Amino acid sequence: MKVITLDTSKCVGCRNCELACAFINSKETCERKFSMIRVNHYIEEHAVIPMTCLHCEDPWCMAVCPSGAITRDPETNAVIIQDEKCAGCKMCILACPYGNIHFDAELMVSHKCNLCEGNPRCVGHCISGALNFEEIEDFNERSRKKVDLEISKYMKQTCKTQEVDSNGK
Amino acid sequence: MKAVIIGNGAASLAAIRSFRKYDKKSSITVISKEGGNAYSRVLLPYVLRGKLSYEKLFLPFSDKLDSLGVTYIEDEVLSVDDAESVLKLGKHGDLFYDTLLIASGSKALWPPIKGICQPGIYHLWTINDLNRLQIEFSEKKEVVIIGSGFVSLQAAWAACSRGLKVTLIEIADRLMPLVLDVRGSGLMAEQMSKFGVNVYTSTITEEISKREDGKFFILLRDKENILADFIIVGAGVGANIDFLKDSAIEFARTIPVDNYMLTNVLNVFAAGDVAAGPSVFGDEHVTHALWPTAVEMGKIAGANMAGQNIRYDGSLNMNVTQMFDVTVASMGKFNDADIDDYYVYDAESGKGYCKLCYKDGLIVGICLVGTSEAVSLLGKLRPIIRNRLAVKLPPAKLDAFLNVRFFQK
């Protein structure tokens, strides 16, 4: 199963992902209001965070939708909203704890990331490698290696200190 | 094991799916009094407005009950014999159960007004009401709406969008007290006036009578009387629990349940509009009669009927809709009596009127008459309110905090 992963330490805040997403969704413009991915800038906190739908395992938006417009695509595993079924009641926007569902004021329906049918444009246009589209297992592997590295660094550090300590005696 | 569910709505469908997750074999029987496929009452005003087509009312899986191994019976439950675990049905005789879920929902009530029960006066609560109102909407010109709850205002919006002349009468001094605070209500009333709706608050309807020309004559106390071609009434709902009269199942206006959706009888659960369950604010028994609460309760009840032991953290009331070109939403506590501090976002935030409410230093609720973008803030606040997390930040910084929080381990 492939998912979009975010490495916030790599994001440079160029907002290319937003432009790419806006274009594929609107078919004609790169205006950011059409984008499903949103890069949030926090100057004081020194943080730049691209946020897009996480396609939760047990999506609350899907459970709560009163018109059954939200389903899971069996091929891409994406949680998708069917325009023609959406009543525009915004219950899903209220349900999403990450703020990743948006409202299309022209069609009066909710909109969200659909993983571009398995070829997410935001990832394709990411210049810094912050966004990746990868097997969840690969991501876990990377996370594990990262943690391993941290631990081994820490171990080295403690061993050295212990050596110094014992020599000093 | 034999599981039986009374009702075929949000709570019931959520319960079926959750039950099947844990138990693929046991039989499930659903009893529906209303009949037909399960549909979404929430969507009736949207169909009336013409935003959704009729067939979109029906819930996913409502026509696939067979595939979920559900036996569907259209019948009325007359009584419950909880000692023998048997239901008495109108046409189908006795039905035995091992585990029972009462999810029979609620019905719209008639307020005590003289002449309220006559042809031409409707609720907007069932598919039947919708069908009859569709005819009125296309043939008539003037409608009076009595009551200003969520459904009433959406009915007003539907009538307004379809070019009818709308008058709204509310007995209380403001609109939607369960959804908005005082200022929010005021803004909503202003917004409706802009769309040409006559809004009467603090107005008592004394009597409704039909004139010879077929028009309704509505007598108001201390105000000039008004005329209407037809009338829609939204004056609250009451639980469908008449069949519990002779059973040992405890009930008042609704059925009190514990955190496991269990009633006082060991193998009887209740969920949705009929149930009064725990709230996130520590209340023991609260009935919201809201869609999301019904889904949550149904999910818990279904799992526990299948032998799980899943505890419900309590319900959090939430409402949202778009009408008269604004988004109206609220969550938790927002009325002045329930809070001790609040913050109203300024115009620059682009939210519209958005009030964040505090009690004892914790965020307990929020209400909004504004933009659709602001609704996502409510979504992000839901876990904060639910888990009673203290946020020691000025409210203007809250958005940033909520977005960054997710990445902090």
Predicted feature residues:
Chain B
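Mid-to-C-terminal Rossmann-like scaffold of FAD/NAD(P)H-dependent oxidoreductases
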Residues: 1-2, 8, 21, 274-379
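Residue-level detector of alpha-helix initiation sites
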Residues: 9-13, 35, 108, 128, ...
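FAD-site-proximal beta/loop scaffold in flavoenzymes
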Residues: 117-138, 225-300
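A short, polar/charged loop-to-alpha-helix boundary motif
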Residues: 372-392
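Cysteine/selenocysteine-centered motifs that mediate thiol-based redox chemistry or coordinate metal-sulfur cofactors
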Residues: 390-409
